[in-house]
Design a protein with these regions (language model features):
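Flexible loop residues that form catalytic
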Residues: 52, 140, 150, 308-309, ...
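Conserved strand-to-helix beginnings and helix N-cap segments that scaffold or border functional pockets
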Residues: 17, 59-62, 157-158, 317, ...
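Flexible gly/pro-rich beta->alpha loop and the following alpha-helix that scaffold active-site loops
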Residues: 2-6, 10-76, 80-81, 87
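Extended alpha-helical targeting/anchoring segments
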Residues: 168-542
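Extracellular ligand-binding/catalytic regions of CAZymes and related secreted enzymes
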Residues: 156-169
Length: 542
């Protein structure tokens, strides 16, 4: 292993060097910061950025090494501060400066402290006085500590260094576009592309040999789907490419691999084969009226009735997905190939996210088409925002999700920062609420996921009885991937899942597209039919 130790003219750098030797049996190459060359960086398997005097702004090379890391990076004290500031954190005079003092087993030498940690970084340790002691990047192999692990008075420094130097993750910067990156995995049986095609977040392209239920993950985590009926189909990721919102990208693996890109397939339109609704117009209207009968009897408040469209699919699903992601950019777009089933999703809806024990759900209930002019567009958005029926639908699901998160939340932590806000997407306006909570200590990410699954926006309320009624009305036909969830879960417990809507599922040359809506006592059956036509417009009129 080749370890580069960047020396910021500190008096403890060679203590760090000998800690590396104790941890890995190799001495690092120690290079003064101003003498570091691209060759030094590119030849290193691990990079350590030492402590030093002053502030990170006085070291102009700091941001680049952290934003575009050629190998896993560990920042110590000044290096840690530089890592955090590279991603937008604030560095201030510490409320509790420490020089040669030991707290919680950590020797501290610092007058400054990091505050306002950005979402891209995850805090992993705080001192008892509230000072941030350690953090890591959520996607990149970058971490750091404010304290000095090399100090003779620090405990745990050797374990920290062994963990950092352990050969469990391979990283290499790559250049190109996500459309090119997906070709790396063109011949793989199991592929996932979690695609923030609207540019709002990170994208993940990955593969792995094993597909199964959620379990203790590899260092690269698991990516996959949960069907509405609860079947878990997750790839145990062994190779991946991670793309930042700025377009910077890195290949990662549980072992080294050589990314080989080819020209992506040309975009292909949706096949113009005949479309067939599982429940035709009269049948669907009759089922809506039956929903309202159940509601009138007091069995439910809201029933999320679904339908589906099927059609022959004599086209390359990936080529069609490339067209869909351009025409309908979405924060939760996704392409998956799982043992012969291909999923093409342009979902706009977050089901559940967990970051640092902070849970967030964003159910969608209420839809209007985008207008043909700016004036009409504003009128449609205003109509949605003031609709008694749509707000009632959304409120019921919001209260349902408050209940679901309450099963695993710290008492009193469930909040609704946004109730019935209008969010606009490429083809529709949506009514969206945001529910947050703090995960109860002792509860796991899987506990949270299962407490809220299936997403209330696809069931109605009360959930248990509504699902029984829907199973009867939908004639015991499995929804499958539609109405389920797509997302990832990391070994550290971060997760993010979307609701599977606006999604084509292709198997054996036949495509299905689920669609539906929430039925309440205020629903007009014909208007509900028109709403599913609006939601299905990209499929019915490609």
């Amino acid at each position: 292993m080749r370890v580069l130790l960047i020396d910021n003219h500190d008096s403890f750098t060679y203590n760090l060097a000998h800690l590396v030797f104790r941890a890995a049996g190799v001495m690092p190459e120690v290079v003064l910061a101003e003498d570091v060359t691209p060759e030094h960086l590119n030849n290193a398997d691990r990079i350590i950025v030492s402590p030093g005097p002053g502030r990170p702004e006085e070291y102009p090379w700091f941001p680049g090494i952290f934003r575009d890391p050629p190998a896993p990076v560990l920042g110590v004290c000044l290096g840690f501060q530089g890592m955090c500031m590279a991603f937008g954190a604030t560095l201030e005079r510490a409320a509790h400066p420490r020089h040669g003092e030991v707290t919680e087993g950590h020797t501290r030498y610092h007058s400054l402290a990091i505050t306002d940690l950005p979402e891209t970084l995850e805090a992993t340790e705080f001192a008892a006085d509230g000072t941030l002691m350690a953090a890591r990047h959520r996607s990149l192999p970058i971490s750091g500590v404010q304290y000095h692990p090399e100090s003779v008075a620090s405990s745990g420094g050797l374990a920290l260094m062994r963990e950092f130097l352990a050969p469990h993750l391979w990283v290499q910067p790559v250049s190109g576009s996500p459309e090119e990156f997906i070709t790396c995995f063109a011949d793989e049986e199991n592929v996932a592309w979690l695609d923030s095609s609207d540019g709002s977040g990170w994208s993940f392209l990955c593969t792995g040999d094993t597909v199964g239920p959620i379990r203790s993950s590899s260092p690269l985590g698991q990516v996959g789907v949960i069907t509405y009926e609860g079947e878990e189909r997750f790839i145990e990721v062994t190779r991946a490419i991670v793309v930042s919102p700025t377009g910077a990208a890195w290949a990662l693996g549980t072992a080294p691999w050589e990314p080989t890109f080819t020209a992506p397939p040309s975009c292909a339109p949706l096949p113009r084969t005949p479309r067939t609704f599982r429940f035709d117009h009269p049948t669907y209207l009759a089922k809506i009226r039956k929903c309202q009968d159940f509601i009138a009897r007091g069995d439910s408040y809201e029933l999320c009735l679904t339908n589906s469209i099927s059609f022959d699919f004599p086209a390359d699903p990936l080529a069609v997905y490339l067209s869909l992601r351009r025409a309908h950019p979405s924060p939760f777009a996704a392409y998956l190939r799982l043992s012969g089933t291909e999923v093409l999703s342009t979902s706009p809806e977050r089901f559940l996210r967990l970051v640092d024990a902070h849970l967030e759900a964003k159910p969608i209930k209420g839809t209007r088409p985008r207008g043909r002019s700016p004036k009409e567009d504003k009128e449609l958005a205003r109509d949605l925002a003031t609709s008694v029926k749509d707000r009632a639908e959304n409120l019921m699901i919001c209260d349902l999700l408050r209940n679901d998160l309450g099963r695993v939340a710290v008492p009193g932590s469930v909040q609704v920062p946004v109730l019935c806000g209008v969010e606009s997407f490429a083809t529709v306006h949506q009514l969206v609420s945001t529910i947050t909570a703090e995960l109860l200590p002792g509860k796991t990410p899987v506990d949270a996921l299962r407490a809220a699954f299936p997403g209330g926006s696809m069931t109605g309320a009360p959930k248990e009885r509504s699902m029984e009624i829907l199973d009867e009305l939908e004639e015991h036909h499995p929804r499958g991937i539609y109405s389920g969830a797509i997302g990832y879960i990391t070994a550290e417990g971060t997760m993010d899942f979307s609701i599977v809507i606006r999604t084509i599922v292709v198997k054996d040359g036949v495509a299905t597209y689920g669609c539906g809506g929430a039925i309440t006592r205020l629903s007009d059956p014909e208007e509900e039919w028109q709403e599913i036509l609006v939601k299905s417009r990209p499929i019915l009129n490609p």
